[in-house]
Amino acid sequence: MSSLPVSESEGEGSGTSVQVPSRGGQVTPGEKAFSLRTKHVFLTYPRCPISPEEAGQKIADRLKNKKCNYIYISREFHADGEPHLHAFVQLEANFRTTSPKYFDLDEFHPNIQAARQPASTLKYCMKHPESSWEFGKFLKPKVNRSPTQSASRDKTMKQIMANATSRDEYLSMVRKSFPFEWAVRLQQFQYSANALFPDPPQTYSAPYASRDMSDHPVIGEWLQQELYTWSPGVRRRSLYICGPTRTGKTSWARSLGTHHYWQHSVNFLEEWNCQAQFNIIDDIPFKFVPCWKGLVGSQYDLTVNPKYGKKKRIPNGIPCIILVNEDEDWLQSMSTQQVDWFHGNAVVYHLLPGETFIPSE
């Protein structure tokens, strides 16, 4: 079963729960004393054969002087066949106890939490019940912000997004209109500012002139057939260059036109430039290149799953220039089938001894 959300409160009356001490109720060194103060309680009784009706009546009897609004108890079975109970309790006012055994049913001790999202907690309890018991009527907690207030805040935020002309101006307007949110959620506003006002793609400036490779028998042919001209509707082949360091490979490749450049790791979190003519994969071991067939094979659309971001679909259809040194030769890390596929989708070239992309003086 999915884990229960216990983050922000949906309304009034949220409380805090401290981890329960060990079964004997004794507080061991380094362990916090148990304390619960809340209007909404969520209980889980593992490996408990008591019926929901019996459990509910016992809990209701225990809370008879506490102005209890609502109780819901459900029974579920784990994959091993053992039953467990979920209980949700709603009271009129904040309930407080420092006894970790307050909700014990006979010898069965529950996990106790303050239900900070009452409606979500109740929905969780009702997800897959084998049987259930209910008492009273659940009262949805009041939302702290009225619809009018929410509409006003949304309107203000839309105006900020429409009128801001830069990241700094956007953040300044947010700070002025929403000072508390700006203080506690600055990182989120910075993220949205970067999304609204991304950095323009940087134009690469080569540190020195590179050798003209248009007459090279292998590289020149690739430039002409796969980069400068190509047949529409036909996936283009990539270029793989393996050779020593300090031969000018990177500077030459980056001077060919607008491109995506990845060194040491492929980062799909960066802004995707739809004007890029090719991708450059520089000094990245084969095993660390995600979607390598999609990139090398110039597939038109790629579905990527960045490590710290959401899965997304990006347009591609452009070839790669892959640059490696001999100690990271991709072909040495591939299976026979992968090598065959690679040769079918990329022009492979190993620099000859003394060959360089740096023009002679």
From Swiss-Prot:
<dbReference type="GO" id="GO:0003677">
    <property type="term" value="F:DNA binding"/>
</dbReference>
<comment type="similarity">
    <text>Belongs to the geminiviridae Rep protein family.</text>
</comment>
<keyword id="KW-0479">Metal-binding</keyword>
<dbReference type="GO" id="GO:0016888">
    <property type="term" value="F:endodeoxyribonuclease activity, producing 5'-phosphomonoesters"/>
</dbReference>
<protein>
    <recommendedName>
        <fullName>Replication-associated protein</fullName>
        <ecNumber>2.7.7.-</ecNumber>
        <ecNumber>3.1.21.-</ecNumber>
    </recommendedName>
</protein>
<feature type="short sequence motif" description="RCR-1">
    <location>
        <begin position="42"/>
        <end position="45"/>
    </location>
</feature>
<keyword id="KW-0678">Repressor</keyword>
<dbReference type="GO" id="GO:0042025">
    <property type="term" value="C:host cell nucleus"/>
</dbReference>
<keyword id="KW-0547">Nucleotide-binding</keyword>
<keyword id="KW-0235">DNA replication</keyword>
<dbReference type="GO" id="GO:0005198">
    <property type="term" value="F:structural molecule activity"/>
</dbReference>
<keyword id="KW-1048">Host nucleus</keyword>
<feature type="short sequence motif" description="Nuclear localization signal">
    <location>
        <begin position="307"/>
        <end position="317"/>
    </location>
</feature>
<keyword id="KW-0548">Nucleotidyltransferase</keyword>
<comment type="function">
    <text>Essential for the replication of viral ssDNA. The closed circular ssDNA genome is first converted to a superhelical dsDNA. Rep binds a specific region at the genome origin of replication. It introduces an endonucleolytic nick within the conserved sequence 5'-TAATATTAC-3' in the intergenic region of the genome present in all geminiviruses, thereby initiating the rolling circle replication (RCR). Following cleavage, binds covalently to the 5'-phosphate of DNA as a tyrosyl ester. The cleavage gives rise to a free 3'-OH that serves as a primer for the cellular DNA polymerase.</text>
</comment>
<feature type="short sequence motif" description="RCR-3">
    <location>
        <begin position="124"/>
        <end position="127"/>
    </location>
</feature>
<feature type="short sequence motif" description="RCR-2">
    <location>
        <begin position="84"/>
        <end position="86"/>
    </location>
</feature>
<keyword id="KW-0378">Hydrolase</keyword>
<feature type="region of interest" description="Disordered">
    <location>
        <begin position="1"/>
        <end position="31"/>
    </location>
</feature>
<keyword id="KW-0067">ATP-binding</keyword>
<dbReference type="InterPro" id="IPR027417">
    <property type="entry name" value="P-loop_NTPase"/>
</dbReference>
<dbReference type="Pfam" id="PF00799">
    <property type="entry name" value="Gemini_AL1"/>
</dbReference>
<feature type="binding site">
    <location>
        <position position="76"/>
    </location>
    <ligand>
        <name>a divalent metal cation</name>
    </ligand>
</feature>
<dbReference type="GO" id="GO:0006260">
    <property type="term" value="P:DNA replication"/>
</dbReference>
<dbReference type="GO" id="GO:0005524">
    <property type="term" value="F:ATP binding"/>
</dbReference>
<dbReference type="GO" id="GO:0046872">
    <property type="term" value="F:metal ion binding"/>
</dbReference>
<feature type="binding site">
    <location>
        <position position="84"/>
    </location>
    <ligand>
        <name>a divalent metal cation</name>
    </ligand>
</feature>
<dbReference type="GO" id="GO:0004386">
    <property type="term" value="F:helicase activity"/>
</dbReference>
<feature type="region of interest" description="Transactivation">
    <location>
        <begin position="266"/>
        <end position="285"/>
    </location>
</feature>
<keyword id="KW-0347">Helicase</keyword>
<feature type="region of interest" description="Oligomerization">
    <location>
        <begin position="192"/>
        <end position="204"/>
    </location>
</feature>
<dbReference type="InterPro" id="IPR001301">
    <property type="entry name" value="Gemini_AL1_CLV"/>
</dbReference>
<feature type="binding site">
    <location>
        <begin position="243"/>
        <end position="250"/>
    </location>
    <ligand>
        <name>ATP</name>
    </ligand>
</feature>
<feature type="domain" description="CRESS-DNA virus Rep endonuclease">
    <location>
        <begin position="35"/>
        <end position="138"/>
    </location>
</feature>
<keyword id="KW-0238">DNA-binding</keyword>
<keyword id="KW-0255">Endonuclease</keyword>
<dbReference type="GO" id="GO:0016779">
    <property type="term" value="F:nucleotidyltransferase activity"/>
</dbReference>
<dbReference type="InterPro" id="IPR022692">
    <property type="entry name" value="Gemini_AL1_REP_central"/>
</dbReference>
<keyword id="KW-0808">Transferase</keyword>
<keyword id="KW-0511">Multifunctional enzyme</keyword>
<keyword id="KW-0540">Nuclease</keyword>
<dbReference type="InterPro" id="IPR049912">
    <property type="entry name" value="CRESS_DNA_REP"/>
</dbReference>
